[in-house]
């Protein structure tokens, strides 16, 4: 159990190192307003913290830096919530204030905004479309031979496809077909739509739509959806701006992993509900052993729909990142309920 004095010194060392990226010595600590102990006392406490494994010496400096154990203790016990600037809160809320909530578009923009606000790499795993439910279908006629089929899901995903209208299908038939599809299919999971249309709805259309076989073939492919989630990155090269990663040889494997994307898909799709913080070698990938990954899930009720994550150095602004992720996931979840 650390003493109050040790807790204060450890927190001050980590806060200073996060901000400066420079090893922290006893002289630096002695100049802090919150530290009122003598230099000798500070040195003794630092020696104890080093012996306990919370801080460690670097080869290039007499100062100390946090260890993975130190960061973990800091995140679990010392972290205080950070109030975000009002302009950032407004910027984030404006993103989610769109009249039509398109989850994919929001996910893509979220990754970009988060990377800009943190200067780290942001990763957003979008909702899995196959679990979405159909909200409604629209068919908008462009001319006599061309129309656009628009599908809207319960999460706001909008999918459109240009279709060719056969000469044997008139506009009144299209209108009847849309009404039947909306009546019979609203609330049906996207993964079940294709089979339901071509095995069940066809018999209903037969009684109301002339040349129903031509009409239904016209929609073939419109209701096919990708089975896996889309993954969006923002600031892929941001890690290069961090002092820890100025050595390109050190960061090459990480950049390769980021560029490949598939590994992050596997990491994020199995995330537990809530805020998760993985520090250094707690991450399963060797390329991430000098990084921290903070992730948060967004959901509707009990159904987890996606994950937002920030990848940065272990010297990450943990409090700020967690506050940002909490705001984003809250806004994302509220938007999906619209």
Swiss-Prot record:
Superkingdom of source: Bacteria
Coiled coil: none
Entry annotated with the keyword Transcription: yes
Signal peptide residues on this chain, from the entry's feature table: none
Record key words, sorted: Repressor, Stress response, Transcription, Transcription regulation
Source organism of this protein record: Bacillus thuringiensis (strain Al Hakam)
Family under the similarity heading: Belongs to the HrcA family.
InterPro entries: GAF-like_dom_sf, HrcA, HrcA_C, WH-like_DNA-bd_sf, WH_DNA-bd_sf, WHTH_transcript_rep_HrcA_IDD
Role: Negative regulator of class I heat shock genes (grpE-dnaK-dnaJ and groELS operons). Prevents heat-shock induction of these operons.
The protein, known as: Heat-inducible transcription repressor HrcA
Example GO BP: negative regulation of DNA-templated transcription
Pfam short name (any one): HrcA
GO molecular function terms listed in the Swiss-Prot or TrEMBL record: DNA binding
């Amino acid at each position: 159990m650390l003493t109050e004095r040790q807790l204060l010194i450890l927190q001050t060392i980590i806060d200073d190192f996060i901000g400066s990226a420079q090893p922290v010595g006893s002289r630096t600590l002695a100049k802090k307003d919150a530290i009122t102990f003598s230099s000798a006392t500070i040195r003794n406490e630092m020696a104890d913290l080093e012996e306990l494994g919370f801080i460690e010496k670097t080869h290039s400096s007499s100062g100390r830096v946090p260890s993975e154990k130190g960061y973990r203790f800091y995140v679990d016990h010392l972290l205080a919530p950070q109030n975000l600037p009002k302009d950032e809160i407004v910027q984030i809320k404006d993103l989610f204030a769109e009249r039509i909530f398109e989850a994919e578009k929001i996910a893509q923009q979220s990754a970009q905004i988060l990377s800009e606000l943190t200067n780290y790499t942001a990763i957003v795993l979008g909702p899995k479309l196959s679990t979405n439910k159909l909200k409604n279908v629209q068919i908008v006629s462009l001319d006599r031979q061309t129309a656009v089929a628009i599908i809207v899901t319960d999460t706001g995903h909008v999918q459109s496809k240009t279709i060719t209208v056969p000469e044997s299908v008139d506009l009144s038939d299209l209108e009847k077909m849309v009404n039947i599809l909306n009546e019979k299919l609203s609330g049906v999971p996207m993964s079940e739509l294709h089979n339901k249309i071509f095995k069940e709805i066809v018999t209903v259309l037969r009684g109301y739509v002339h040349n129903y076989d031509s009409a239904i073939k016209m929609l073939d492919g419109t209701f096919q959806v990708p089975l896996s989630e889309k993954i969006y990155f923002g600031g892929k090269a941001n890690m290069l701006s961090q002092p820890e990663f100025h050595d390109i040889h050190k960061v090459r494997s990480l950049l390769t992993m980021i560029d490949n994307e598939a590994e992050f898909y596997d990491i994020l799709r199995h995330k537990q509900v809530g805020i998760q913080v993985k520090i250094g070698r707690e991450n399963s990938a060797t390329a991430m052993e000098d990084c921290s990954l903070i992730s948060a899930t967004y959901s509707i009720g009990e159904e987890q729909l996606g994950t937002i994550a920030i990848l940065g150095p272990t010297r990450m602004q943990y409090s700020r990142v967690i506050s940002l992720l909490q705001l984003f996931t809250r806004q994302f979840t509220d938007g999906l309920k619209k």
